[in-house]
Each structure stands twice: as C-alpha cells, then as structure tokens.
Amino acid sequence: MGVSLAILHYHLRTGGVTTVIRNALTAQYDRNAAVVLSGPATDLAKLLDAYGAKDLIAHKVKVLSMAAGAFPDGPPEPNIRANIAAARRVFAEWPTPIVAAGYEIGTALPFPAASIEQDFAWSATHPIADAYRAYRPMPYDAPTWAMAALLYAVRPKENYFRLSEPGTVTVLDDGRTQFRASAEGMHRYLILDPDRKESIIRTYTEIASAKPVERKKKLAAK
C-alpha cells in the first residue's frame, strides 16, 4: 500500500499519503475496507498519528492484511527490517484485526517464470512483467509475499489459506517477529495448505495476467 499510494500522491499532487489513505477510508462503508500493506509500515504508522485516525480505522476497516514477518519464527523479514519502529507500532496500535503473510508463505508460492515470460504477451508493456524483468534477469520464479496478502484480503471466503489461532505479534529490536497465541489477540498469520498450493499459484497467474475489462461507455443524456 505504501508504494502504490506514494506513486498516486506523486501523480495527483495530493496533500500527502496520509491524506490519500484517510480520504479512501472515509469514502467506505463501515467495516467494509480491507487494507493491504505490501512494503514497509511507514505510511500506516504515520496515519496512526493523524487526529481521529484510529477511530476512523476502527469504523471503516475490517482487516489489515500485510506482507510482513516470519512465522512461527524466522529471520528478520525485509519489509519489517526496512522500518522496525513503524512495524512495531502498527502491530501494537492498529485497532482492527491484522493478518500477516509471512516470509515463508511468499517463498513457498513462487510466481512462475514461464507465466512472466508468456502470459503477459498480449501487451507490449505490462507493469508486473516489466517489474519482474527489471528486478533481475529472467528466467526466475518470483516470491509472492505481497500477492498472498492481497489474495487473502480480496477473497477471504475462498479459503486459499488456513489461519493461525488468534494471538499477538510483537516486533523485536532486531526485526524478528514473535507470535504468542491468546484468545483475545487480534493478530493471525497465514498458513499454507499444501493441497492448495497449485490452485493458489494458478489463481495468481490468472488474475495478474488478465486483460483489463473495457468499461461500457455511458449513453449520452438526451
């Protein structure tokens, strides 16, 4: 979310990323918004500082799905390591349920190189394929941390993933995440069901490479 909103802010010259997020949430029905974080938690931590933001989040957001951490344990994950203080604050103060797509999920569900090289050929340029090619020379299968967080957020009832028991995620000083189960906890993390692995990767490729649907032009007013 941080990267995409920063780009949106640059092009639209809005008052700032925090303003963009607040305006987007204000326009939503109560408990209707799903927030997806695919990078460092910097912008969401700044949002928590804004006047009335926590109440707004609590009323508008049903879940924060974030590509962050490593579960049940593991080394510091890059998104958290990029801004440890911001990640710690979001996990500690965000007022709605949080679901984390950990490092282990992204590495277990690689986006196929064959899809990157073939399925986007309908367009001379495509932001997804171009980004993968720019990151490193093809072919390579790309980890999908952000895609996992997004897929859970937009299709939670499809049961692509299992969820951990409720608990609390704490960000340690070195960037590692510690999960402690508790009935009153508001945090969970995604767990991969091996039987769903192929269907998840297939869903990734189908959605990511789909051609945009043309909008029908409105009839001119008589």
Regions found by a protein language model. Give the residues of each.
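N-terminal acidic, glycine/proline-rich low-complexity segments
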Residues: 1-222
